[in-house]
C-alpha cells in the first residue's frame, strides 16, 4: 500500500492517496519524483477537445489504490444541477497514463487555473498534457462546458498536498475560467472547529463523472492541516472544501480509514503562494488590501471611528467646526475676544452693555 505522510498534531500519520485508477489490470504507485514546476509547453496547433473515457469497465481497480474513508457520517448526495452557483467550478479530472487512467477532482480558481493535489499531478510523470479537466461534468456523456488540456503544473513548496494546474484554451479559444465562474476563496479569518462544511467532487465509487456532495463538520484545524468527519472515497482527491458561504476553505487530499478525512487548509502561507502564482484568484473580503485595519470604512483608513466625517475625526457631531466643538454659535462665548456681547471683553465699547469696563 502506497503511503503518504502528513504532520498532524506533531505526529506523522500515514495517509492513503485518493486518485482512482480505472480500466487497468495493474497500477503503479503514484510517483513523487515529478518536477515541482513543469515548463510551459507552447500549443502550436489547436488541440482536439478532450473527451471523458467511458465504458462498462470504468471502475476503481482496487480499494487499496484509494482512500475509501467512509465514516459514520455518510451524508452524501448527488448534485445534478452542476452548472448552478458554486458547483460550476467543481471539476472532474482524468490523467491518462501508460498504466491506465486516473480520475480525481479539482476546482477552477482563475481564468486558466485549477487547484488539485500534488499526488494527482504526479501521475502525469512530467507531461502536463496527460491531465484533462471537465468543469461541471454531469456524467460521462454530459459535460456541458467541454474539456480542457493542461499545459503547466506548479506544486506547492510546503508540506500540503496542493498543486496549481494551468490550462490551454479550448478549440473556441475559451479558457476554463471563462466557461465557468471561478470559485471564491475564503480568507479563513473566521474558520474554526465545529463549523459546517461540504466536500464536493467526483468520488470513484459512484457512476463515472457524477458530482457528489458530502456534508460534515470540521474536527481539527492547525496550520495547513484540516480534518473533518464527513465521508469521501477515491476520486475525491482535489475536491474543494466549502464553508457555509460557499467559499473554498481547503483542498481535500484523502483520509485515514475509520478516523478522519482531511484537506490542505488555506492558511496565510498557502494563501500567499496562491496569490503569487494566480494573478486573478479571488479571495473574499480582499477588495481593500491596503486598509486591513478598517474594513468597515475602506475610504477612510485613518479615521476608523468616524467614517462620516473623515476631516474631523475628533468631533464627529460637528464636522463643520473642528476648532470649536462645544458651542460654535454661542454669542456669549468667553473665548471669542471680538464678541461685542462678551462682558469680559475689555475692548468692548458697546454702550448697550453697562457692565462693560
UniProtKB/Swiss-Prot annotation:
Residues 30-68 form a propeptide. Transmembrane segments: none annotated. InterPro entries: Glutamyl_endopeptidase, Peptidase_S1_PA, Peptidase_S1_PA_chymotrypsin, Peptidase_S1B, Peptidase_S1B_tx, V8_his_AS, V8_ser_AS. Gene3D superfamilies: Trypsin-like serine proteases (2.40.10.10). Residues 33-58, 282-357 are annotated as: Disordered. Its main location: secreted. GO terms for biological process: proteolysis. It catalyses: Preferential cleavage: Glu-|-Xaa, Asp-|-Xaa. The active site is at 119 (charge relay system), 161 (charge relay system), 237 (charge relay system). GO terms for molecular function: serine-type endopeptidase activity. The record marks 68-69 as: Cleavage. The keyword Protease applies. Residues 289-345 are annotated as: 18 X 3 AA repeats of P-[DN]-N. The keyword Iron-sulfur does not apply. Proteolytically cleaved by aureolysin (aur). This cleavage leads to the activation of SspA. Its EC number is 3.4.21.19. Residues 40-54, 291-357 have a biased composition (Low complexity). It is an enzyme of class 3 (hydrolase). Keywords: Hydrolase, Protease, Repeat, Secreted, Serine protease, Signal, Virulence, Zymogen. GO terms for cellular component: extracellular region. Preferentially cleaves peptide bonds on the carboxyl-terminal side of aspartate and glutamate. Along with other extracellular proteases it is involved in colonization and infection of human tissues. Required for proteolytic maturation of thiol protease SspB and inactivation of SspC, an inhibitor of SspB. It is the most important protease for degradation of fibronectin-binding protein (FnBP) and surface protein A, which are involved in adherence to host cells. May also protect bacteria against host defense mechanism by cleaving the immunoglobulin classes IgG, IgA and IgM. Belongs to the peptidase S1B family. This is Glutamyl endopeptidase.
Amino acid at each position: 500500500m502506497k503511503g503518504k505522510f502528513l504532520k498532524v498534531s506533531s505526529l506523522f500519520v500515514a495517509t492513503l492517496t485518493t486518485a482512482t485508477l480505472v480500466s487497468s489490470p495493474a497500477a503503479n504507485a503514484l510517483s513523487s519524483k515529478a518536477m515541482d514546476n513543469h515548463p510551459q509547453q507552447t500549443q502550436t496547433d489547436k488541440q482536439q477537445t478532450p473527451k471523458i473515457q467511458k465504458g462498462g469497465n470504468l471502475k476503481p481497480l482496487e480499494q487499496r489504490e484509494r482512500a475509501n474513508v467512509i465514516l459514520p457520517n455518510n451524508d452524501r448526495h448527488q448534485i445534478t444541477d452542476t452548472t448552478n452557483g458554486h458547483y460550476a467550478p467543481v471539476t472532474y479530472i482524468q490523467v491518462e497514463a501508460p498504466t491506465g487512467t486516473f480520475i480525481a477532482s479539482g476546482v477552477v480558481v482563475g481564468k486558466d487555473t485549477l487547484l488539485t493535489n500534488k499526488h494527482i499531478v504526479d501521475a502525469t510523470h512530467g507531461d502536463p498534457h496527460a491531465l484533462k479537466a471537465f468543469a461541471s461534468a454531469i456524467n460521462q456523456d454530459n459535460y456541458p462546458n467541454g474539456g480542457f488540456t493542461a499545459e503547466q503544473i506548479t506544486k506547492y513548496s510546503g508540506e500540503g498536498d496542493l498543486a496549481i494546474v494551468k490550462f490551454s484554451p479550448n478549440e473556441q479559444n475559451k479558457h476554463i475560467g471563462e466557461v465557468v465562474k471561478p470559485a471564491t476563496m475564503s480568507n479563513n479569518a473566521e474558520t474554526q472547529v465545529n463549523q459546517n462544511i461540504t466536500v464536493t467532487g467526483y468520488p470513484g465509487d459512484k457512476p463515472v463523472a457524477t458530482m457528489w456532495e458530502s456534508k460534515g463538520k470540521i474536527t481539527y484545524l492547525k496550520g495547513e492541516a484540516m480534518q473533518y468527519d464527513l465521508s469521501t472515497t477515491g476520486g475525491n482527491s482535489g475536491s474543494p472544501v466549502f464553508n457555509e458561504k460557499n467559499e473554498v476553505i481547503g483542498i481535500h487530499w484523502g483520509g485515514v480509514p475509520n478516523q478522519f478525512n482531511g484537506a490542505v487548509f488555506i492558511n496565510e502561507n498557502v494563501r500567499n503562494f496562491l496569490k503569487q502564482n494566480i494573478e486573478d484568484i479571488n479571495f473574499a473580503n480582499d477588495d481593500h488590501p491596503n486598509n486591513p485595519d478598517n474594513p468597515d470604512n475602506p475610504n477612510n483608513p485613518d479615521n476608523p471611528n468616524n467614517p462620516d466625517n473623515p476631516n474631523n475625526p475628533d468631533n464627529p457631531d460637528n464636522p463643520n467646526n473642528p476648532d470649536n466643538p462645544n458651542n460654535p454659535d454661542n454669542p456669549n462665548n468667553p473665548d471669542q475676544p471680538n464678541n461685542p456681547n462678551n462682558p469680559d471683553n475689555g475692548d468692548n465699547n458697546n454702550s448697550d452693555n453697562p457692565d462693560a469696563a
